């Protein structure tokens, strides 16, 4: 369900930031280090999440993600407090829908937009075969 896992910044895409060697790319490279380290410690995956970046990308080009209607709620108590619950099949809320959720993302389109809009870099040749 969490499409942001598909666009998590991996080592090779993160290394491009370092090689661009601008003030902004260096900043993004540095702030993604903690996410990279935490994901390695907890999941043994060398990626840094980019949840907020995907949201911004959606506002710039809504064809980047595919959406489906569903009933979505946020848990307010207990061990799952703060987690979003998506009733995908409408089993618990009689097929009522109050929002849409992203179920897929175009990874290549996302990275092309990310590098072009933020760093003015065309990385098409680097991501097309990804």
Regions found by a protein language model. Give the residues of each.
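N-terminal acidic, glycine/proline-rich low-complexity segments
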Residues: 1-130
């Amino acid at each position: 369900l969490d499409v942001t896992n598909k666009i998590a910044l991996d080592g090779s895409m993160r290394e491009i930031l370092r090689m661009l060697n601008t003030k902004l790319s260096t900043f993004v490279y540095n702030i993604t280090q903690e996410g990279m380290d935490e994901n390695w410690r907890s999941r043994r995956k060398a990626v840094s999440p980019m949840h907020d970046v995907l949201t911004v990308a959606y506002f710039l080009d809504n064809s980047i993600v595919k959406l489906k209607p569903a009933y979505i709620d946020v848990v307010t108590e207990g061990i799952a407090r703060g987690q979003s619950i998506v009733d995908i099949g409408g089993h618990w809320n009689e097929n009522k829908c109050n929002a849409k959720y992203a179920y897929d993302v175009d990874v290549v389109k996302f990275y092309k937009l990310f590098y072009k809009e933020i760093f003015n870099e065309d990385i098409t040749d680097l991501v097309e075969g990804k």
